[in-house]
Curated annotation (Swiss-Prot):
The keyword Zinc does not apply. The gene is mgsA. Catalyzes the formation of methylglyoxal from dihydroxyacetone phosphate. Pfam families: MGS. It comes from Leptospira borgpetersenii serovar Hardjo-bovis (strain JB197). It comes from the Bacteria. One of its GO terms (biological process) is methylglyoxal biosynthetic process. Its EC number is 4.2.3.3. Residues 4-147 form the MGS-like domain. This is Methylglyoxal synthase. Belongs to the methylglyoxal synthase family. The active site is at D69 (proton donor/acceptor). Substrate binds at H17, K21, T43, G44, T45, T46, S63, G64, H96. The keyword Transmembrane does not apply. One of its GO terms (cellular component) is cytosol.
Length: 147
C-alpha cells in the first residue's frame, strides 16, 4: 500500500448521460460557490453545457461516445483527477457502455471517489475532506502484477 496526497484544490470530472445532463447542471448550480474553488473537467457536451449555464470554467475532453470517458479514465490513471461526478442513465443502453464500465473500474482501482447520483454527490461535496488536502491509500499495483 502507498499513500498519495490529494490537494485541497480538487480536480473534478463532471460527466452526464443525455437524460441526466439537466440534473448535473442543476447540481453544479446548487454548489457553484464551492465548485468555483476547484478545477473542473468534463466530457464535451456536458462540459460545454455546465460552462454556459454556470459561467464556471470547464476543461473539456471529447464527448463520451467519442472517447471522452476513456480520456477521463486515463487522467485518473495518471493521477490527474481527484473526484468524478458521473450522473449516468441506468435505464438507457448507451453505445459506449464498455467505456462507462471501464471508467467505473479505473475509478475504483485508483481509489477515486465517484458519485453516480445527486445524493452521493451531495454527501461528497459536504464532506470535510472536500476542501482540505487528503492522503488516500492505493494498492501497490506493481506487487500485485508480479504475483
Amino acid at each position: 500500500m502507498k499513500e498519495v496526497s490529494v490537494p485541497a484544490t480538487k480536480r473534478i470530472a463532471l460527466v452526464a448521460h443525455d437524460n441526466r445532463k439537466e440534473d448535473l447542471v442543476s447540481w453544479v448550480k446548487a454548489h457553484r460557490e464551492i465548485l468555483s474553488k476547484h478545477r473542473l473537467f468534463g466530457t464535451g457536451t456536458t462540459g460545454k453545457l455546465i460552462s454556459e449555464e454556470t459561467g464556471l470554467p470547464v476543461t473539456r475532453f471529447l464527448s463520451g461516445p467519442l472517447g471522452g470517458d476513456q480520456q477521463i479514465g486515463a487522467k485518473i490513471a495518471e493521477g490527474d483527477l481527484d473526484i468524478v461526478v458521473f450522473f449516468w442513465d441506468p435505464l438507457t443502453a448507451q453505445p459506449h457502455d464498455p467505456d462507462v464500465k471501464a471508467l467505473l473500474r479505473i475509478a475504483v482501482l485508483y481509489n477515486v471517489p465517484m458519485a453516480c447520483n445527486r445524493s452521493t454527490a451531495d454527501y461528497m461535496i459536504s464532506s470535510p475532506q472536500f476542501t482540505i488536502s487528503y492522503e488516500k491509500v492505493l494498492l501497490n499495483f506493481e506487487l500485485l502484477c508480479e504475483s
